[in-house]
Structure formats: C-alpha cells, structure tokens
Amino acid sequence: MSSGHFFQWHLCDVFKSAMCCVSCTHTLSLLLCVLTLTSAATGAGPETLCGAELVDTLQFVCGERGFYFSKPTGYGPSSRRSHNRGIVDECCFQSCELRRLEMYCAPVKSGKAARSVRAQRHTDMPRTPKVSTAVQSVDRGTERRTAQHPDKTKPKKEVHQKNSSRGNTGGRNYRM
C-alpha cells in the first residue's frame, strides 16, 4: 500500500469521526433544547378556561348539539360533587379535560329530528289543508295565551346553540 493510499484512507477516517462528533454535538444540543422546552411547558401549570374562551371551546367541542352550563341530571356520581356545580366551577377555577367538556354537550338528536329541511325534497312535505281565517284567528289567540302562560310544572333545560354573532374565529386554536 502506497503512502498516498494510506493518507487518503486516514483522511477519510478523520472526516468520518469529525462528522460523527458534529452529529453527536448537534443531537445533544437538540436534546437539551427539547428537554428545556418540555420542562418549561409542564412547569407553567394547568390551563383554565373562563368567559368567552370557555364558551368558544364548548361551541367547538359540542358543535351543532349545543351545550349546558349546568350539568344535566344523570351525569356522574352525585355523591362526589355538590349539585350546584357547573362548567364554570369545573373548568374556570381548575383545569379540565376534554372528557369533562363533553359532559356538558347536549345529547345528539335522533336522525329524523336532525335531518335538515333543505335536504328534504319538496315532494316529501305533506300538503296542509286550507283553513278558514276565523279558525286561524282563534288558533293564534290560543298560541298567545300559551306563550304568555308557559307550563311551570315542567323542568326546562336551557341549551346554548352556536352563537353566530360572535364572529369568525379565523382558525384560532383552542386550548384544552
């Protein structure tokens, strides 16, 4: 083996070890950076959702179903929580997970009720018989009386639908 070949092989080995050192140094610095960012993120503490941010997140999670501010009956063991707690108590004063937010979504409507009127063909709609104007005025009076005196014996649940007046979120990310 000539000295030229020996020098060429030796130089190649030097470059390989130099590349290995650079690669190891680069990997080590990248690892330190990731560890620093991870510990800073976990040290920031739990994230809470309050006010408009809570409402926006609930609208995002629940979608068209809507949501309740107080938990509907039948969710979770009642012995663990007091009965007057709601989503604000659970997510504004302490951090809450996605599962907790989903508990406040309104139930999914049945397939027939959720079907859009626009999706129906116009021939699917039954024709209503014409009614005389005298009967219509009596019906409207009954409707007014019913609206003025709602049945107070039935419990009412207030479902909050998506509020389109809040504006477009513009692709805003939601924190959980």
Curated annotation (Swiss-Prot):
Disulfide bonds join C50-C92, C62-C105, C91-C96. Transmembrane segments: none annotated. GO terms for biological process: cell population proliferation; hyperosmotic salinity response; insulin-like growth factor receptor signaling pathway; negative regulation of apoptotic process; negative regulation of release of cytochrome c from mitochondria; positive regulation of cartilage development; positive regulation of cell population proliferation; positive regulation of phosphatidylinositol 3-kinase/protein kinase B signal transduction. Residues 140-161 have a biased composition (Basic and acidic residues). Residues 74-85 are annotated as: C. One of its GO terms (molecular function) is growth factor activity. Residues 45-73 are annotated as: B. Residues 86-106 are annotated as: A. It comes from the Eukaryota. Pfam families: Insulin. The insulin-like growth factors, isolated from plasma, are structurally and functionally related to insulin but have a much higher growth-promoting activity. Acts as a ligand for IGF1R. Binds to the alpha subunit of IGF1R, leading to the activation of the intrinsic tyrosine kinase activity which autophosphorylates tyrosine residues in the beta subunit thus initiatiating a cascade of down-stream signaling events leading to activation of the PI3K-AKT/PKB and the Ras-MAPK pathways. Binds to integrins. This is Insulin-like growth factor 1.
